[in-house]
Amino acid sequence: MSILVRRFQAYLLSTRRRSVLTADAYIREIEMLESFLFQYGKTLLDASEEDLLTYLIRRSQSGLQRTTMARIIASLHSFYRFCLNEKLRADDPSIQIRTPKQDRNLPDVLDPDS
C-alpha cells in the first residue's frame, strides 16, 4: 500500500469516522484504480475525469450491481475530496461523476383477507 493510500485510510478512520469495513472497501477500490492508472503511465494524483470514467466503464462491464457501482463512486469522491483537503491536487476529477440511481421496489401491500 502506498503512503498516499495509507494516509487516505487514516483520514477515513479518524477524520471521516468510517467503519473499518467501509474503509477497507474504499481502500481496495482506490488500490484497484491505482493499478488501472499504472497501466497507462498515470498516478492517482494526475488522473483526469476521463481516466476515472474509463475505469468506471471497465468496472461496470464486469456486471457489477448499481449498489456496488455507487460504492465505487463514493470511494472516488472521498479520495479526491481528501486530496483537495490535503492540497495534493488543485481540482477534483470525480466531481462531475454521479452515482447511479438505485432501483426502488414498491412495498408489499398486506391483503386483509389473508
Language-model segments: what does each one mean?
Residues 106-114:
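Long, amphipathic, Lys/Arg-enriched alpha-helical "connector/arm" segment
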Residues 5-21, 27-106:
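N-terminal core-binding DNA-recognition domain of tyrosine recombinases/integrases
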Residues 1-4, 114:
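N-terminal positioning helix adjacent to the helix-turn-helix/winged-helix DNA-binding module
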